Amino acid sequence: MVGVAPRIETRRARDCPACWDLSAPEKATQVVARPRMDEAPSPEECMAHAVASLQHSDLMSEIPTSDTFQALMTRYAPGYRRSRSDTFPLTDPTLTASQLVSQAAQADHWRRIVSMTKEYILTSVPHTEAPPASDVDTLLAWWHLRLVSLWKLHFFSNLQEEMQALWQVLESVRVYEGDDLRVLVDTPHVSFPMHVLRAQVLLQNDRRRGIQLLWKHMQRAKEASADSIWRARYIRVALLLSSLLVEMDALPAATSLADELASGLGSADAKLALVLCRLYLQMSDMASASRMLSRAKSAADPADAALHAAILNHETMTRFISEPHADHEKLVVDDLKDVDQALTNTMALDAFFHGHVLESIQILERLMHEHPTTFTTTRALAPNLLTLHSMGANHPQEEKQRVIRFLVQSAGDDPWFVDQRAG
């Protein structure tokens, strides 16, 4: 079964070599002095060229016909054939484009969003001789949404291909910024989140370069962190960078970042304290993890049931890691009204490890029926439930068929397309 993290591997710190100079200098921002007006293109011409360049259909790749959901169906229901409804954009003349996208995102229909963003990139901005600068902002916003959707679908090869193609445009097209002619990538048109996403994509093939860019973006956000928006950006990038450094066993650098975030914790930063708790657990720093857990408890709003569930989940993980071979009492959370998916999976694993397979099944079944969207879009839950049913004594094949039909129905497809031999 796929666990939330009842056991986190202890990592040994490696010497941080000199080549990990995360503050490596970047090349200077390209600023092209504005030449005489009889030689230079006009601002309107530059903007029109930028808009046209961002709307090239060649920048977008062909999307695969299968995704994570399809892979699950292929494994457990080989006769299943997905309907075409999820591969086309939603249409409703009463809703705006942003409302349609919001609906699709809430339902985790990222494939639909990919289809919609392609249409909007190609058609939402008309070709004119003097487009406003906001047209570039609009197109880049749709591009950002498209790239995030590809990430959500785990279409990483498509993501890398499209990001590379887009970045070539951003680094070659020039627009005016005041009296200077700059490459588009160095202007405010390219948002901070887009820069961070590009660094994350680079991590797939060039981890060192990706980390250096994340470090650069983190420092930029830190310098402006007096503003609440930039502080939130600084925290997000610092957490991302810390996690990557832990994965690389660069524990001194990861610890330094985590300690810096911990020292700046406010009285209401319960959620951040929990994230830091998890980071310290991954680094096997039990003392710091316990300290962050205590900070989260003291800062938590008693009325926030979801936060209470997350705290309980981290308490459980800390207990398992501290004493992995101890015979712990079973985890009981009957008083919680809202249980998040991570805690639910931990509860199911806890029951399973105590030999209570049927109780483990009941815990996951309850979440499946009460929160179907959460269940069908969380990767560990469905495989774990199907695995548990395989261990059950009462008609495992029929039970797995029932779960598969529920998953298909929740995805908006016809459940009777599932092969009767599945399971």
What annotation goes with each model-predicted range?
Residues M1-P93, I113:
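Intrinsically disordered, low-complexity acidic/proline-rich regions
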Residues A97-Q103, L145-L147, K152, V190-V201, ...:
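"A position-specific structural signal for the A-helix of alpha-solenoid helical repeats
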Residues A107, L153, N205, M248, ...:
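Structural motif corresponding to the intra-repeat A-B loop/turn of tetratricopeptide repeats
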Residues I113, L159, G210, A254, ...:
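Single-residue signature of alpha-solenoid repeat helices
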Residues S124-D135, S172-H189, A221-A232, A262-S267, ...:
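Flexible helix-coil transition and linker loops at the boundaries of alpha-helical arrays
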Residues A130-R209:
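Helix-rich alpha-solenoid scaffolding regions
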Residues K216-A299:
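Solenoidal tandem-repeat scaffolds enriched in leucines and small polar residues
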Residues A289-G423:
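Structured C-terminal portions of repeat-based eukaryotic scaffold domains
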